[in-house]
């Protein structure tokens, strides 16, 4: 059970940051996982008054505020068009609409949970995070960092000419995933493939363009590279060996799908 001594609705990012420097204080986010912890919170810091609940699309990027809910993300027409439905596919299995109306992008990215569909999804994009004091860094670098007490302000997704594809394996429709896979094929033929729910946090693999190589051959090559390198673990949802096998299977499917799309668009 979580006990909160004081509640403060921050009036500025500076105030939120100052409050968050005390170890006993916590940023609330969407209060999905935090409320399940057995902790005593000195001051609960609410960011809902700072205008961080919007998605702004420009010609070259998306700016996604930390307080944007997963449901907002799921329903955003611009993101749906840009990712060819990958965002919706990544989010639709997360428990239910009620939870997705509460859970925030910032909470999902800051937590860097191993099972996070959100982290896996954005890892395959040209995505950065903006921290109040730490500035803008790549999501990949942020995912590898230890937890700190900075304030995550927004995600920045740079638009690029690419095709995206998302898959997950689950034991039931809305369960935590056994393994997740997000893939991007860039216009020059290079690939970015993120594998999550290992059950460790998502990792990114990048493959150079190999134009002229048959799709099946390229898919097998990428799948073997991922299988031979990935570190997986076991839990109640699956063994390390099973996850390693799935990583290869999902990588192969992703490459075959994206190569087929590219070939179709070229005809």
Where are these regions (language model features)?
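C-terminal structural segment of proteins
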Residues: 1-267
């Amino acid at each position: 059970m979580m006990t909160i001594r004081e509640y403060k609705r921050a009036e500025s990012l500076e105030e939120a940051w100052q409050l968050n420097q005390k170890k006993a204080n916590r940023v609330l986010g969407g209060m999905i996982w935090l409320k399940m912890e057995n902790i005593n919170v000195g001051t609960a810091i609410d960011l809902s008054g700072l205008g961080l609940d919007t998605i702004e699309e420009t010609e070259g990027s998306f700016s996604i505020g930390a307080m944007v809910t997963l449901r907002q993300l799921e329903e955003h027409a611009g993101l749906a068009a840009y990712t060819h439905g990958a965002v919706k596919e990544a989010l639709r299995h997360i428990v239910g609409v009620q939870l997705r109306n509460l859970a925030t992008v910032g909470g999902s990215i800051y937590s860097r949970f191993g099972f996070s569909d959100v982290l896996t999804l954005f890892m395959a994009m040209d995505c950065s995070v903006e921290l109040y004091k730490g500035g803008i860094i790549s999501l990949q670098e942020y995912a590898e960092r230890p937890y700190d007490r900075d304030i995550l302000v927004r995600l920045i997704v740079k638009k690029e000419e690419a095709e995206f594809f998302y898959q997950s394996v689950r034991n039931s429709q809305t369960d935590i995933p056994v393994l997740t896979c997000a893939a991007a094929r860039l216009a020059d033929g290079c690939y970015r493939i993120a594998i999550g729910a290992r059950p460790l946090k998502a990792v990114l693999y990048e493959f150079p363009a190999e134009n002229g190589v048959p799709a099946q051959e390229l898919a097998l090559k990428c799948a073997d590279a991922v299988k031979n390198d990935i570190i997986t673990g076991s839990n109640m949802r699956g063994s390390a060996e099973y996850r390693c096998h799935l990583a290869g299977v999902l990588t192969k499917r992703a490459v075959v799908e994206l190569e087929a799309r590219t070939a179709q668009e070229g005809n």
